[in-house]
């Protein structure tokens, strides 16, 4: 797991290959793997930060987007790890970096929120998030809201 590189960019700074890699990974997981026939690309992509984790070969292995919301709150969304790269700890590394990058980019950030698929809660709990809602359906998949207060 050495030679990993985090890259953080806003939409207008992404090159064509980075954008392709992001949309390919998200579509392969959120649409194809999870059989979720809902649009994957949305207007949020235009105004959020894109956090990418690449391996030594330059392959995009994990991704999340960082969305500043109301005062002092950042939403972490579209957290995804390449199916072939799971069980390598990339999800946890990504989340720790997402928190660190959010603190740097949005210095007043004190609260972090996300919408977790039910099965992914242990990952988010491992970095300090706590469940703060009952289960609800998002695109037909059970989710819960989770929050981390600094």
Curated annotation (Swiss-Prot):
Under InterPro entries, the record lists: Acyl_CoA_acyltransferase, GNAT_dom, GNPNAT1-like
What are the coiled-coil residue ranges? none
Q: Which Pfam families match?
A: Acetyltransf_10
Q: GO: which molecular function terms?
A: acyltransferase activity, transferring groups other than amino-acyl groups
SUPFAM superfamilies per the UniProt record, alphabetical: Acyl-CoA N-acyltransferases (Nat)
Highest taxon of source: Eukaryota
Q: What sequence ranges are listed for the domain N-acetyltransferase?
A: 9-150
Recorded hits in Gene3D superfamilies, A to Z, give: 3.40.630.30
- List the GO cellular component terms: cytosol; nucleus
Q: Which PANTHER family match?
A: GLUCOSAMINE 6-PHOSPHATE N-ACETYLTRANSFERASE
Tell me which family the UniProt entry assigns to this protein: Belongs to the UPF0039 (ElaA) family.
- According to UniProt, the name of this protein is UPF0039 protein C11D3.02c
- Which species does the entry assign this protein to? Schizosaccharomyces pombe (strain 972 / ATCC 24843) (Fission yeast)
């Amino acid at each position: 797991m050495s030679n990993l590189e985090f890259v953080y960019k806003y939409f207008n700074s992404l090159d064509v290959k980075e954008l392709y890699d992001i949309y390919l990974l998200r579509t392969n997981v959120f649409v194809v793997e999870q059989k979720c026939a809902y649009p994957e690309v949305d207007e949020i992509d235009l105004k959020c930060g894109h956090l990418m984790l690449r391996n030594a070969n330059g392959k995009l292995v994990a991704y999340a987007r960082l969305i500043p919301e109301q005062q002092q709150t950042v939403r972490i969304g579209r957290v995804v790890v390449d199916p072939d790269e799971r069980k390598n700890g990339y999800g946890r590394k990504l989340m720790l970096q997402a928190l660190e990058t959010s603190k740097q980019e949005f210095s007043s950030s004190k609260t972090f929120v996300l919408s977790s698929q039910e099965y992914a809660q242990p990952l988010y709990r491992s970095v300090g998030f706590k469940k703060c809602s009952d289960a609800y359906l998002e695109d037909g998949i059970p989710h819960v809201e989770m929050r981390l207060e600094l």
